[in-house]
Amino acid sequence: MPFIKAQKVRRDESGRVVSGSASVVDTEYVPGARYHSRQRVRERLGRVVELAEDGRSGVFRSPTRGLVRYDADTDSFEPVERGDGTLDDESSEFPEPSAHVVAGDSLLLLSILESSGLLAVLRSAFPKDAELERLLAHLLHSVLRDGSRVSCDDLVARSAASHLLAGVSVPSLRSDSAYFHAMGDDRAKVAFFRSLVDAMRAADPSFGTCCYVDSTPLPNDLADNPFNAFSSHGLGEAAVQSRLVLVLDDATGIPVWYEVIPGNVVDVSTLARVREDVGATLGVTVSSAVLDAGYVNRELVGGDMRYLARMPARRGYPFKTMWHDVKPQVNRGKYAFVRGGHAYFGRHFVREVQGTESHLYVYVDKENALSCLRQTMTDRPEEYEAMLERDKDWEQARGGFFVLISNMDEMTPAGALDAYFSRMEVEQVFKTAKDHLRLLPIAKWTETAMRGKVLHDVICTVAVLRVRKAVAAAGRPWSPTDLWGKTSSLMCFRNGPSLVLETPSRQCRQRFEGLGYKVPAKVDVAAYRRDVLGLRS
């Protein structure tokens, strides 16, 4: 049976714990050891907040679980919320929000989310107040931090959200294990996407045609990533990979489904399984795909699915042959174009691949090719000098050479690359799962937590897309960075049941009024929680 091992616990005159730490410890039977047993720390509970007289239960500020109650007799954890009677003194763990906080950015974002219908989607998917408040706190942080490294608890503490989302313990937001595990549950994923799809279908009855996207692997520098698998997809050496599959609405590019899969299961059967899951769960049709080279085989090339994919550099595909075909033309200006700050060579061909006539788009990214060549000549000069002339020619293009294969209608090389990148770049939003995981101990890199992080990123992406749509509809040139920067100058202070806003600057007022909103003189907190956020308490 486990027990709580407390260390250096000190109490004040009233008996309240003022310092100390604790761990959950198991006793194991070990034949031949002293006392035939050995103690093993199962989990560190962190700082002691309250501890029962018998030492068998208490409240702790866990580095991985946040504020939590642990009972050794039942070996169970329970979250601690404001007003649930667990703590005798809640003032230290649920401090009152600051009197003077930033209001403009959070109020503008919440106004956009309400008018766009996303708040209603979230209320439908997460009907419990505690779940919705915690989700909104993390959503505000992810969108408003705009690339900065400010932590969630710090941003919320100095924002009007600390008053509007009073049911959330601000210190618990720093390492919110419970939130990401709850978001990683399949029920949360299905509830959100069903609610989102219902809202999109209500706004546009023709909604229902989607694109399957899996063009690049997730970052593989997490050694303990539970999805990682050793794999190769025909473009380079084998590596440990996990992959993110997205299903995007064709018209808006909004994600309506995702899967995280090991890198070694990438093939047409994975595509078929995801199509079936999406159809059965959401009632939408996946009619096209943007794919990495690992998916390309005879079944895909000869099938009915419309696709755009990278050609693998393996037997049966004219990868190297296409290089020899275009080599004399690579430096001709008529085939050059620029995308994303890179100069490209691009040509279109129609060739038979795996018995099926296909469109091939051959490219050389001049910047990437030059960088790779420079690295080879610097790091391995003897190897480069010993190459044959034809191999040196190939080395000059190798780092930037790639081929796209498609059965869609013919496009220009620039158009095909735009079609590929426009879908692929949506994935890049989710490649930073490691940003959250770096804040957590290795024990927190679980499959459930990672799925929860991806779902959270999907929700944040939908929110940012709604912001961009609102700005575009208003005909304004403002970026999200501009919106949050200019409106964060608007401060407020608490006066009884209301937040009283200061006089906004001219630029702040322009942002609100330009998007169709008025800057309120004051906000009744209870009414705002009830009418705007849809909270029942």
Locate predicted features.
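Dynamic "connector" segments at or just before major functional cores
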Residues: 1-212, 216-222, 246-264, 499-537
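Short, flexible loop/turn motifs enriched in small residues
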Residues: 16-21, 236-242, 397-399, 425-426
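Short helix/loop capping segments that flank catalytic or ligand/cofactor-binding pockets
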Residues: 32-33, 147-153, 163-165, 220-223, ...
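Electropositive, glycine- and tryptophan-enriched low-complexity nucleic-acid-binding patches
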Residues: 238-280
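An anionic, glycine-rich sequence signature occurring as long contiguous blocks
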Residues: 240, 260, 306-419, 489-537
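Acidic, metal-coordinating catalytic cores used for nucleic-acid/nucleotide bond scission
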Residues: 266, 289-299, 313-315, 448-449
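Short amphipathic alpha-helical "interface-anchor" segments enriched in bulky aromatics
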Residues: 415-443
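Basic, amphipathic alpha-helical segments enriched in Lys/Arg and hydrophobic/aromatic residues
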Residues: 445-468
